[in-house]
Amino acid sequence: DITVLIEDCPHTTAKDEGKGYPLVRTPNIGEGQLLLDGVHRVSKEVYDKRNVRAVPQVDDIIYAREAPAGNVAVIRENEQVCLGQRTVLIRPMNTLIDSVWLTYAMLTPYSRNHLISKATGSTVTHVNMASIRPFDLPLPPLSEQHRIVAEIKRWFALIDQIEQGKADLQTIIKQTKSKILDLAIHGKLVPQDPNDEPAIELLKRINPDFTPCDNEHYQN
């Protein structure tokens, strides 16, 4: 066994009180980390009631059993949370397993497909506790887990840089297109012949009733 505990969430719904402790529901469980922007919050009293069986702590893992099933995240420093519905608290045995490594392992297609293949529900996929507790994983030595985690983080950081570069490039492309259109509309995209008739004179010839405005672009 590589866990100290695997604890189901309370099967009740807690009302969002707008302030207090984060209530981790399945939408707040990302791929590796908690997504706490806009999270529902509860009072100290509700927090204590929902954590009566186990208080989530740093390096614990929270698993989403539904909507969407399969996401898993590690609790970080300063994340004092309680569980919403359809979530599971997993506490790895830290002398045997790195919490981040276990999180990555549970996010692999193999692990996700294995657990979801045992899920129930015709419309909404629901992973049962009975499928989570006996789940087997190959376990490398702790030092190897640390090395794997470091390598994964290195590659993920590189991917983030590429994604940011892609976003920056899209912004530049959009700005450039807007600038080209602006220059074209203002007659500045191609060299202008100083002997060309001013646009305002052309408009007067086309429509004798034309009344010029103060827009300087009609003067060119």
Question: Where are the predicted features?
Answer:
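Specificity-determining recognition surfaces
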Residues: 70, 105-137
